[in-house]
């Protein structure tokens, strides 16, 4: 029989899929997956921000999911009944666009299909292609309760959306009104935060508006000359002496000769342009408010597709942006254009299709800002905490400026607004499809054609996924809402603080009377190693799936957590990933070494079972690492947790404990137990290698024993500070002795003996001597109280080490040092500072650099001369 040879390096691709499938199949990711270690009344709930059903895993997702999964795994191991709730967002605009393009490639328009047939096509696409991101999450090791995956268009969630709408409608918090909205001619109405502003180079057009006498004119500056057809007035500041005499008179609208009044309002900035502005209430947010104050007519000059209408005269049927150049040309022809200036300004674009957004008066459904008042007050009372804490300032600033939230969208795909109107114009909200009007019993009913903003349904995510309003429907577990609302923690990117987090806060508080979570952790953005935003055009995008393929999921998870310093953007490079793959390999080698050396491994869970000094020291350091890891995780300091685990496992365990074990062989079993416990600390960050190495050290296989993920997380136990200090002194002495050897050993000189002077006494100097002789590779190390007469020394933190020079032939070392002095002398000459002409004529920066180099060379020269003086003493 051919025996399978064990790999000599860590191979993540060989174990990750197998481990994940076993753990998933056993139900470890579910609410009661850790039932054996659950503690009474300990609950933890974490909601996955639902990615778009159209989405693929990008590095931002990978960061959010890694941090969430770290926390979920930690809480499971710590005895919490844990719900890590996954799901998908129906992504109204994005999904409709995907399916529309697919149909157009077949020559089919959605309008030809009609609403019902188009929605069927979307559901077909969703079942076939949607949700690929969920499978990609599993590659990352995400341990969400996938059997409970929710979709914002699920039957249960649709009911919650209708119920929320009904409750707010009945309270007067949802209204329908004509209002100025952000309008995308492709995607319809957008909320304020769905508009992305970009700085653009444009033009400022100075247009002449003649007065009624047709002799005098006013000049008005505008960036959008095509909107002049919607002007209802000209406006000046009442304090502007240039125009006071004109207030109350009329001006003639260029090109179409309609008369408009000249009004005064302090809204006008006298310094901008000419100090006289056009007022277009139908197509400007500020002008809309001015129009209401002055009772001006609101004129819409284009339709929902951006096509100019009859108000625009000869320009009717032109697209709004296409019309601009033609309007400017006609103004020039009629001597109505004073001048054009270059002008840089902010232009709003649709966050989805990047179309230029227009202010547009439209009849839409809105949620009133009053809905948020109670949640704002509770945040002020500290009932939810932001991490980092400075994000509360951003939240407060935005909430102070909260405007009515436009929730209606002109789409087919989404939650159709549950408002019905009968033939007698009675309007009502219904949770189910009504048979008749409750007011007049008319059976001729029409449902509102618009759908709700995607963020409306995702704003209910914290409780709609738990069965709110339909606990007894059979679609949800009856106890879910009671057990897991409020949720415990929210982890997401700061970029959706206003899109999603703020809305969840006020939606949840308004409907359930409690904030949806206690802690809100907002992470920064992932950028490239130079700190630049990743983009396909720059070619600097890091694909998480490719990184998993190359470096393993553990390396990616650990790297992202390690770089996630509070409040700072993450600068990610493949060097980080390579380093952490090396870290995984270091652990693999350490476990392989211990397994090779051990005769038998026995679990040693209790502190008093650690008998050897090295074992007790290693356990004490493990207890320290446990305390730090727990504290870091409890306070969302993911980078601190990874830093200390890296330091403990590589810097202490691999670099020192393993080395010490070569002297103290009987500690091998105990070091194995320490490493197994340390792997539990590491598990939330690196679930695959921790699982694999734990079983390797235990001589077990995951296939026939419990997973590390449902074992208790190590407890914070007492440390032996006295023993720890003793080993710190030993380590310091070894490092100092090694430096001494490097300084002295020049063939044929071999340092065989050295001595150590301690700044303060330790209990066991024999242990120090034993370790120092073996690990510094010396035949003899003495502990002394005074410096030998003829010796060279090295100074450590806790010690000073000495090499006696009396019995050594130092001539090779002296020759080496003299050669170094000659080399330094040549380097000094190359600096040219002895040359008066150079010093006089060299640029200041060059001269300063040369002087700095000379300073460094002189310092080296001084040290070498000191060593030579010591070595050449009689």
From Swiss-Prot:
| Biological-process GO terms, alphabetical | valyl-tRNA aminoacylation
Q: What class of enzyme is it?
A: ligase
Keywords assigned: Aminoacyl-tRNA synthetase, ATP-binding, Coiled coil, Cytoplasm, Ligase, Nucleotide-binding, Protein biosynthesis
Protein name stated in the entry:
Valine--tRNA ligase
User: Is Protein biosynthesis set as a keyword in this record?
Assistant: yes
Task: Indicate which residues the UniProt annotation says bind ATP.
Answer: 536
Compartment list: Cytoplasm
What's the family? Answer: Belongs to the class-I aminoacyl-tRNA synthetase family. ValS type 1 subfamily.
Q: Where is this motif: 'KMSKS' region?
A: 533-537
The principal location of this protein is cytoplasm
Q: Which reaction does it catalyse?
A: tRNA(Val) + L-valine + ATP = L-valyl-tRNA(Val) + AMP + diphosphate
The protein's Enzyme Commission number = 6.1.1.9
